[in-house]
């Protein structure tokens, strides 16, 4: 495989994010890279794809800047680009937690757990393992025994913690996310909230899965990624499928976006049921006048109505 996908972040001071973003975009485009990078005064958060040669140039370029000299890159092999375009955008935060009183992970953050230390924490009955990702990420794959916060956006996590404080009080708390960036800030917030013994998986799931000692053990399912691959394997020892098909509950790891452009909910759906239910998560979405699946496949009104009848046999959860 000649292509690679890079995942990286660094909390560091960038004085002029707008100028940095514009110049960085030009550099990335000139080196045939594609991906999404967020830049703010608090640092950089990126994932991009390119050939081995082009990604090597990018890594070398970043490491030559003293602000990013020690930045860690998590690298996956790929068969081609994982993104369609290249975006570098200035933002208020490089990860959106939206706190009234922001947390600087360079000052306050949870204890770093190496992959082997995290594996020990997974085996410890007195430790709570808290997934800091969104519900649809958790539903595709997660660490065995981890708590699933009922959230669809990272910024909703603090409210969920406050509402479920009783699950965490007096426990050792270790949190994890895809590459580590969300946990840097989130674990710092937990410390500020008064929780004691707060830790985080250093380098995230991506690092744990490649560690030669842990080999991704105790991970069930796949890891959701925010690019065209959608998901990647983590556990090198045993493979399990924990995702459940939206309509029939059978094992499934195929995510699509609901065909209603006003919904866009991510659902696990087989190809057969995507076709049967018009790529939608519910009857209301399937009959939406701008259904993208209907438009893309040139489905006639007669056929559209025929497939809407399929929803009569669907369990209640898919009628919402």
Swiss-Prot record:
The active site is at residue 177. It is an enzyme of class 1 (oxidoreductase). Transmembrane segments: none annotated. It catalyses: uridine(34) in tRNA + AH2 + O2 = 5-hydroxyuridine(34) in tRNA + A + H2O. GO terms for biological process: tRNA modification. CDD domains: RHOD_YceA (cd01518). InterPro entries: Rhodanese-like_dom, Rhodanese-like_dom_sf, Rhodanese_C, TrhO, TRHO_N. Residues 123-217 form the Rhodanese domain. Pfam families: Rhodanese, Rhodanese_C, UPF0176_N. Keywords: Oxidoreductase, tRNA processing. PROSITE patterns: RHODANESE_3. Its EC number is 1.14.-.-. Catalyzes oxygen-dependent 5-hydroxyuridine (ho5U) modification at position 34 in tRNAs. This is tRNA uridine(34) hydroxylase. The lineage of its organism: Bacteria, Bacillati, Bacillota, Bacilli, Bacillales.
